[in-house]
Curated annotation (Swiss-Prot):
Origin superkingdom: Archaea
Catalytic reaction equation(s): L-methionine + ATP + H2O = S-adenosyl-L-methionine + phosphate + diphosphate
Lineage of the organism: Archaea, Methanobacteriati, Methanobacteriota, Methanomada group, Methanococci
Name this polypeptide is given: S-adenosylmethionine synthase
HAMAP family: S_AdoMet_synth2 (MF_00136)
A Pfam family it matches: AdoMet_Synthase
Class of this enzyme: transferase
PANTHER family to which the protein is assigned, alphabetical: S-ADENOSYLMETHIONINE SYNTHASE
Family from the record: Belongs to the AdoMet synthase 2 family.
EC number: 2.5.1.6
Length: 405
């Protein structure tokens, strides 16, 4: 049995505190673009390694930088003047010694990485011309000797932690968290883009709850080729606002809602227009790990890890595995009858099996009529089950079935 500790969460339930702030950066935000590319590159490398070598080899591709380009904006359609520059860096296993033949096997790391980055951009930014609007530069290098050695030495056994670090998670999502998350998903959904094509992918949703009132302040890029006048632009905002308000009704749970879109606009002179759907075309830079946490949100009223989850290897890198695992455990613990709220923290120790954390800390707020003592064994059972099946978490990541930002 792992070192699992269960205790009462000594705080007011999140939905009852007077003020709550929640943020989500949409898939077209420069930071989220970097997160998405980093994770897509990692997943592609995992698949390439398994195809070529039968196992996932060591890599960390969590160092993606975006340098903003420059665009000439015009109602009815502008153009890019200077392309967005994206740098792929990090470390990956590029050569493997075949112990049976004694030959060095060279692996197509950089080709795989560039193709994955371009495929992701094509999927995420529908108005970007990949031939003209962006430059993808790959500078991924060979992995650290020490880290590769730890990875290779342990890969046929239980993976061992490559760092002393921690992951955190919480569940269930608060009303504000649900609305912020679902609002961005709505605005970047295929259905909404088909109905309102002028809505770009660079969307940021900031949620503020004061008592029973939730205010959403939304920054929403518009694509200039679909906007022929300022009146068109105002209409796009009004249509999007109506969609957000209608969608939010499913999650409001008695709260009042106010939706504000592009509050910096001066509808005569200053509006949020883009050519490609992202502010990365206008000098906004981006980096991995500066945006959403592993659960897709930025939650200053909850515990958060500063680790960038996207792009890290899914076998031994605690910054990835334990953050994702913490959220999975929290979600399952929160499903136990009598658990109102749950927070998870998992701490590793470098070189130790990932199934044996130094501590797995569970904090819970019981529902009225339930005692911590009766909930504790059930929560421990959930946590131990996931530690025993941690390879399932890795498989979800490698398959691309886990959200990391």
């Amino acid at each position: 049995m792992a070192n699992i500790v269960v205790k009462r969460l000594e705080r007011t339930p999140i939905d009852e505190i007077p003020v709550e702030i929640v943020e989500r950066k949409g898939i077209g935000h420069p930071d989220s673009i970097c997160d998405g590319i980093a994770e897509s590159v990692s997943v592609a490398l995992c698949k390439m390694y398994k195809e070529k070598m039968g196992v996932v080899l060591h890599h960390n591709t969590d160092q993606v930088e975006l340098v903003g380009g420059y665009a000439y904006l015009e109602l009815g359609g502008g153009c890019m003047v200077s392309p967005i520059y994206i740098l792929l860096s990090g470390r990956a296993t590029m050569e493997v010694l075949d112990k049976e033949t004694g030959k060095i096997i060279k692996l197509p790391v950089n080709t795989t990485a560039v193709n994955a980055a371009r495929d992701y951009l094509k999927k995420a930014l529908r108005n970007m011309d990949l031939e003209k609007d962006v430059v993808v530069d790959c500078r991924i290098g060979q992995g650290s000797v020490d880290l590769v050695e730890v990875f290779d030495r342990k890969r046929t056994e239980i993976p061992h932690a490559n760092d002393t670090s921690f992951g955190v998670g919480h569940a269930p999502l608060s009303t504000t968290e649900k609305i912020v998350l679902e609002t961005e998903k709505l605005l970047n959904s295929d259905a909404l883009k088909a109905e309102i094509p002028a809505v770009g992918e660079d969307i940021k949703v900031m949620g503020l709850r004061e008592g029973k009132k939730i205010t959403l302040t939304i920054a929403m890029a518009a694509v200039d080729k679909y906007v022929n006048s300022c009146a068109d632009y105002v209409n796009v905002k009004e249509l999007a606002k109506a969609k957000v308000e209608e969608n939010a009704k499913k999650y409001l749970d008695g709260h009042e809602l106010e939706v504000c879109i592009n509050t910096a606009d001066d509808d005569e002179d200053c509006i949020f227009l883009t050519v490609t759907g992202t502010s990365a075309e206008m000098g906004d830079d981006g980096s991995v790990g500066r945006g959403n946490r592993a659960n897709g949100l930025i939650t200053p009223f909850r515990p958060m890890s500063m680790e960038a989850t996207s792009g890290k290897n899914p076998i031994t890198h605690i910054g990835k595995i334990y953050n994702i695992l913490s959220n999975i455990i929290a979600e399952d613990v929160a499903k136990i009858e009598g658990v109102r709220e749950c927070q998870i923290r998992i701490l590793s120790q470098i070189g130790k099996p990932v199934t044996e954390p130094k501590i797995l800390d569970i904090e819970m707020i019981p529902e009225n009529g339930f005692e911590l003592e009766e909930l504790s064994p059930k929560a421990k059972e959930v946590a131990q089950k996931w530690l025993d099946n941690i390879s399932e978490v890795t498989e979800r990541i490698v398959s691309g079935n886990v959200t990391t930002f």
